[in-house]
Amino acid sequence: MKRPLACAGFLYLVIQLLAAFLPPAAFGPLAAVFLAAVFPAWKLGGRFRTHAVLACTVTGAALLLRMAAFTWMMAPIQARAGTQAEIHAAVVETSPGFLEDTVRAGVLVDEVNGMAVRPFRVYFLSLPQALPGECFSARVEFAELEENEYTYGNYADGIFLAGEYLDGFLPQGESGALWARAKRVQAALSMALRKVLAQPYAGAAAAMTAGDRALLTDEVKDAFRGAGLSHVLVVSGLHLSAVGGLVYAAVRRMGRRRLACACAMFSSLAFMCLTGFTPSVVRAGTAMLLLYGGALFNRKSDALTSLGLAALLLCLQNPYAAVDVSLLLSFSATLGVLWVTAEHRRWRAGSAAQGKNAAR
């Protein structure tokens, strides 16, 4: 089989997408059916036995992992809906609130009523002014997420619960986690841009260069959306490719090819961390790591394999990432570009061969 890793990654993505429309009770039985079909597929598959075994194995494993994610990740969090609690949390991301001195925020809760819990994310429509990376304590009420066009996007971000702020907001310093430090670097870059540019230009520039969308206003978002350019406000593979390419070119001038590859890989990882591992950046980052990693060890990278691996990595860390519209559009567009490129090369090769035959 050609490109087994790519096939496994794309199949895993498709299965997790389809699983979003299945009742949770169906995950276990369906997983058992597909895993039980592995041996018959190997015995009766004939020339396609490898494909059949891979399909059954990946499908069964994907459904098992989806069942585990629902049982141990999603259900316990959603069970808190309707309860009030004193929480300790760190702000992950913010956007301007509807009222003065408030923000809409996604927070990471690590303590409930004074007891440490497995961290989980909650979305607040209104929270007192806070910055990403800052910790706070407050009394809140948990609630179920509203069923709307943003529901699957919240699931893809690991948010399964909404929160309503009640009272007692008290800042608790800054988080020392890696993601929080990356957020502070983002904030520093945004502050530097704010000193040079006025709003709304500073917010748009920060979103396009550092992935910091905190300064984006609804008017700017609506304007870009109306022009069909909302994707420009998101850090994408273009930015990552430019950073990695510039680092590689700068170090390569010293005559150290392997050192240049290693530096480009490090810069790609650092940029992925800075932008919060968004789907488009992870997809491009995986491709860049395979490209420079292959060059580092004198191996040739493959675009489809890197794309399939990126899909697998994104959905392994959160199976609900498969329902993210931006992820699906990003992968679909990349697959389309790869297919058109391959067809164009095949057409050029055929035209060149016909030209040589005609010349004879």
For the regions a protein language model found, what residue spans apply to each?
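Aromatic-rich juxtamembrane segments at the membrane interface
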Residues: 161-287, 292-293
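Beta-strand/loop nucleic-acid-binding surfaces
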Residues: 114-130
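Membrane-helix interface "capping/anchor" motifs
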Residues: 1-4, 43-51, 252-259, 295-305
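N-terminal leader/targeting segments
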Residues: 1-78
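Internal transmembrane alpha-helical bundles of multi-pass membrane proteins
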Residues: 9-13, 24, 277-360
